[in-house]
């Protein structure tokens, strides 16, 4: 059984008799000497989708829920539902747009390496690869000879995500984006 300090974003945990999916974790360090470090977790109930914010001391023991990961690819949009297809047995997994809004900024039909987290036979979340390749649709014109400077400019991707890119990058180029930090890594 891991401590609260060992829990990572994207984990499925058991708390108060329910299974929750951890979406965000923030570390709170009190300014007093004797205060214990707290971990504030934003979690979603797997069964109902209800949001819950809980704080745990760093050494609180937390039960991990049983879950599995399945490799999948984005298939199509059906109204407000996004459908992903299992890469091995072609099982469709449906997600409501609001439940995966943040992940959708990185997902296109070409995105490889998606993982679906399944708890009790139901899909609960999408795990993104560490980096994805996206195409730039809107940015300021590239500046010749700007490769020596470290200045950046905003660029909008095909998914609507906006990141800072070097000045020498132009519209239509594919770039590699870090999905955890939302930052430009390199040309694709």
Swiss-Prot record:
Q: Report the family membership.
A: Belongs to the elongation factor P family.
Disulfide topology = none
Gene3D superfamilies reported for this sequence = 2.30.30.30, Nucleic acid-binding proteins
What are the recorded GO MF terms, alphabetically? translation elongation factor activity
Question: What would be one Gene Ontology cellular-component term for the protein?
Answer: cytoplasm
Can you tell me which residues the record assigns to a coiled coil? none
SUPFAM superfamilies with a match to the protein in the record: Nucleic acid-binding proteins, Translation proteins SH3-like domain
Write down the InterPro entries for this protein, in alphabetical order.
Elong-fact-P_C, NA-bd_OB-fold, Rib_uL2_dom2, Transl_elong_fac_P/YeiP, Transl_elong_KOW-like, Transl_elong_p-like_YeiP, Transl_elong_P/YeiP_cen, Transl_elong_P/YeiP_CS
The name of this protein is: Elongation factor P-like protein
Which terms does the UniProt entry file under GO BP? peptide biosynthetic process
Name the CDD domains on file.
S1_EF-P_repeat_2
Q: Which domain of life is it from?
A: Bacteria
| Organism name | Aliivibrio fischeri (strain ATCC 700601 / ES114)
List, alphabetically, the SMART domains matched.
EFP (SM01185), Elong-fact-P_C (SM00841)
């Amino acid at each position: 059984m891991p401590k609260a300090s060992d829990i990572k974003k994207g984990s499925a945990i058991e708390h108060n008799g329910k299974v929750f999916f951890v979406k965000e974790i923030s570390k709170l360090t009190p300014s007093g000497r004797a205060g214990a470090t707290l971990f504030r977790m934003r979690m979603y109930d797997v069964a109902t989708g209800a949001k819950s914010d809980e704080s745990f001391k760093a050494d609180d023991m937390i039960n991990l829920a049983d879950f599995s990961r399945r490799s999948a690819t984005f298939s199509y949009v059906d109204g407000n539902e996004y459908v992903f297809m299992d890469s091995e047995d072609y099982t469709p997994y449906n997600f409501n747009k609001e439940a995966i809004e943040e992940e959708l900024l990185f997902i296109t039909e070409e995105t490889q390496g998606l993982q679906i987290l399944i708890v009790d036979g139901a899909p609960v979340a999408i795990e993104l690869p560490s980096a994805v390749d996206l195409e730039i649709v809107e940015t300021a014109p590239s500046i010749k000879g700007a490769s020596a400077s470290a200045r950046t400019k905003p660029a909008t991707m095909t998914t609507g995500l906006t990141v800072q890119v070097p000045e020498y990058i132009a519209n239509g180029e594919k770039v590699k984006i870090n999905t955890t930090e939302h930052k430009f890594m390199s040309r694709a």
